Amino acid sequence: MDSPAFFFTFFLWFLLLSATGYSIYVSFGPPSKKLRDPFEEHED
């Protein structure tokens, strides 16, 4: 457990899970109300 590879792997997993959680929060949470929809802005 003292190897640097363990801590590096743990850090990468934490970074990946944090980025995934934040993107889901922005996409579907309260901040999603501020996102614009370019398909609704453009009419053909």
UniProtKB/Swiss-Prot annotation:
Annotated membrane topology: Single-pass membrane protein
Subcellular location: Plastid, Chloroplast thylakoid membrane
Keyword terms, alphabetized: Chloroplast, Membrane, Plastid, Thylakoid, Transmembrane, Transmembrane helix
Classification via Pfam families: PsbN
Disulfide bonds: none
Primary location: plastid
Gene Ontology terms: biological process: photosynthesis
Alphabetized InterPro entries for the sequence: PSII_PsbN
Function: May play a role in photosystem I and II biogenesis.
PANTHER family: PROTEIN PSBN
Name of the protein: Protein PsbN
Gene source species: Tetradesmus obliquus
